[in-house]
């Protein structure tokens, strides 16, 4: 079952990248990885092949926090991605372990804050807002771009901007649509 999930992940990633290549222009394409494939040789090979096929695309690989269990392997992944011209993002930051050690040792280009932290942030206590704001400042000081996930309301977006988020993602900015309608 796991191999099937990984095979599907590879197939969907290839389809997404090749179908989006003509539509992206200067915009980056964020792609998810299956936590079990992130450090595998087949993943490295498939990503290398996709880079050769579509060198014009600005790819960003999202690394889920559950995939990060070994700092040495993470550094190797970071070096590999850099060598093939792919940036990476820590996905779902704050959903479980904060991964502060990894932020310092293997800095990502983007840090995607989990939607669970930011849902109804406009209604949250000042203390919660301060914690998130301090984390955003830390991410910025480490040279990464903070991205707020799951933003649905303008009030949430404004609080996120005030906290220093550079990017937002969620239904406020657009709902999922078929690629051919982009």
Roles of regions detected by a PLM:
Residues 1:
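A short, well-structured catalytic beta-strand-centered motif of the EAL phosphodiesterase domain
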Residues 5-75, 150:
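Catalytic core of bacterial c-di-GMP phosphodiesterases, primarily the EAL and HD-GYP domains
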Residues 16-19, 43-50, 70-81, 99-102, ...:
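A general structural detector for well-ordered alpha-helical segments in enzyme core domains, enriched
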Residues 23-24, 54-55, 81, 85, ...:
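A structural signal for short coil/turn segments at secondary-structure junctions
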Residues 34-37, 62-69, 87-182:
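EAL-family c-di-GMP phosphodiesterase catalytic domain
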